[in-house]
C-alpha cells in the first residue's frame, strides 16, 4: 500500500493527488489518502475522497508519497517517526529546501 499525503491547501481539489492515485492504482498498487494539515478543516477535502490518518496505516505502507511543500514533508515525517518506510516528496511549495 502507498499512502498519498497531500497538503489540500496546495493541491486544491486534490487534482494531483487523484492523478497520482490513478497512476499508482493502474500499476497495481493499493493507495490511501492521508491528508496533512486537514484535521481541523475538513471542508478542504472533497466529499468524494475517503481519507484516514497516516498513523493508522503507516506500518502497512511500502512508501509514503507526500504532495506539498517543505512543511508538509516535515509534518508527515514527524508522524512517521520510528516507522521504517521511505518517503517521496513532490514539491508544490515555494521554498523547496527539501
What are these model-predicted stretches?
Residues 1-9:
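Generic N-terminal amphipathic, Lys/Arg-enriched alpha-helix
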Residues 9-13, 37-39, 49-98:
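Small-residue-rich beta-alpha loop regions that form the catalytic core of phosphotransfer
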Residues 15-17:
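N-terminal basic/disordered segments at the start of proteins
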Residues 19-29:
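A short, Lys/Arg-enriched amphipathic alpha-helix followed by its capping loop at the start of a domain
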Residues 29-37:
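Short internal beta-strands
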Residues 43-45:
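An N-terminal domain-cap segment
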Amino acid at each position: 500500500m502507498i499512502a498519498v499525503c497531500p497538503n489540500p491547501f496546495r493541491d486544491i481539489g486534490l487534482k494531483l493527488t487523484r492523478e497520482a492515485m490513478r497512476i499508482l492504482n493502474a500499476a497495481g498498487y493499493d493507495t490511501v489518502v492521508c491528508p496533512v494539515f486537514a484535521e481541523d478543516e475538513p471542508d478542504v477535502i472533497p466529499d468524494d475522497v475517503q481519507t484516514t490518518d497516516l498513523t493508522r496505516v503507516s506500518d502497512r505502507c511500502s512508501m509514503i508519497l507526500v504532495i506539498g511543500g517543505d512543511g508538509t514533508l516535515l509534518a508527515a515525517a514527524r508522524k512517521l517517526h520510528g516507522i521504517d518506510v521511505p518517503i517521496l516528496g513532490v514539491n508544490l511549495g515555494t521554498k523547496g529546501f527539501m
